[in-house]
Amino acid sequence: MVVKAAKNCQRCSLMFLDSEEDHHDSKNFAVAVTETGKGKFREVKIDDPAGHFKGRTIRVTGKVIVKDNQPQIEVDEPRQIEAV
């Protein structure tokens, strides 16, 4: 997927990489990087995953879940996201 929008959610402590500019778009697919995942990205010298992946095409591995009527994959490890 191409990351068209990327943002940190202050109230939920997740960082989102979205396939659409508007995260409410019914076509949006979200990659949610957990607080643990953000710490692990810092360990591999990626301090801002949102900025690092925005505009890039990525491949993500993990279990797809539906949260708030939107499909997403929660990421806990940097190896789950690959720039392609």
Where is each model-derived feature located?
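OB-fold single-stranded nucleic acid-binding module
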Residues: V2-V84
